[in-house]
Amino acid sequence: KCDILIGLSGCALLSAKKAKSRYHALFFCDRGCRHILSQDDILNSIPSARQVYRKDIKIELEQYGMADYIILPSLHTKESFIQEGEKVEKLFVNPYGVNLEMFHPLPLESDGYDIIFVGNWSLQKGVDILVDACLKSGLSLLHVGAIVDFAFPEQNDRFHHIDPVNQPELIHFYSKAKILCLPSRQDGFGLVLFQAMVCGLPLVYSHYTGGPDLKKLVDDHEFLFEMPEYTVDSLSDTLLKALKKAEQQPRNSIRNYLTPNAVSNISWQAYGQRYNEFLLKIATEK
């Protein structure tokens, strides 16, 4: 018997139909990013970016319609569903977490870069304006991840690229940078925000990431910097503010601005607890 089926969006259509017809189960559609139509609009505005597959749109929309609840990782993803006409009562936001055994506070290496960007080097993640902002302000950048749909400026010695590494190896690279930047045009959350924050790096991010959610989970917001506008100038100014804050961190010692309460709020255990409480509440009402 199945009381509740949790299925990833785009992957659970047939399972959801069977669970609802055979067991009268509730279907929770777990969507890791913005509404598919919003995501499609964003990518359509960047012709050279990887686009949404047309067949995926139909499947996603059918799942949204079937779902009793839609599980989302961030406030901006919730906003996108509301903008597409979804009922607020159907949406549950549960921010992701971080492996606290894998990531922990670190000192900054003496020859560190100004900025680290971790993840796919893609237009969807805003790397084009990140490059322009770095060039404008003369900042150095370390990238760890795959090159996707935007050329990496390898001819400039201020930029350094590392191919994708296994997640446990990332902590080594976080020690090489003063701040992390994630200027995505749309990113469901961006787990690298959690990772870098736990390692002690100030964060710069766009509204279209999980950055705004972090302000609800941690006590000290002084090291969290959201771009006021999605422009090169705004990003450049925000990067400089974050770097100024990074200069105030202790030299040659551990960087750590999170309280024990904040650390507990951003763990995977906390994510599971929030999810479990929601499931129990719904199961009781069913």
Where are these regions (language model features)?
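Short alpha-helical donor nucleotide-sugar binding micro-motif in glycosyltransferases
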Residues: 64, 172-177
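Short hydrophobic beta-strand element within catalytic cores of glycosyltransferases
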Residues: 202-207
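Carbohydrate-associated surface elements
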Residues: 76, 97
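Acceptor-binding helix/loop patch of EC 2.4 sugar-transfer enzymes
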Residues: 25-58
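Nucleotide-activated donor-binding/catalytic signature segment of Leloir-type glycosyltransferases, i.e.
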Residues: 150-171
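Conserved donor-binding/catalytic core segment of Leloir-type glycosyltransferases
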Residues: 107-125, 131-136
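Aromatic "clamp/platform" in nucleotide-sugar-dependent glycosyltransferases that forms part
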Residues: 185
